[in-house]
């Protein structure tokens, strides 16, 4: 490794279940003392232990990548917000909440196609899934992150889904065709609302808010 950070494996301590703890860790992609953490989600029913190493692929595929502020397993996270790639939805037509829900958007993966460091996370989703062959990469900054979605050249659809799984929220898209704003009301242990501002490096073909918080 060129840097000692290359030896860090953030998946250590994530092989847990209700009968035995092996760390109860959140695989946090973040800089030291970062404002946000970013974590893959394989268990959308939990906002702290949202990633379980031993249940992936056929058992529990990737739901999304989440922004999180989980201080520990025992103190619930807050200010969470999710994004996920998708190739199964035809965004040019009508899009419903059911079409971009956790059940609909989840995509199988294997740990062989996953790179998990504090300074860099990537995963390539299995072909034939709701995000067929898509590679997601996350690089953190002090208050945000750079995200890259690489879609197969022959993908019929290239979508990015936004959500606020564990709280109410809002989502709006800018008139410039590239920027968006979101708010998540997932609060806990004194944590307040979180506001999100993002921008794509190229214009989208179509953007739509579903309900108030998804899109």
What name fits each language-model region?
Residues 1-215:
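Accessory carbohydrate-recognition regions in carbohydrate-active enzymes
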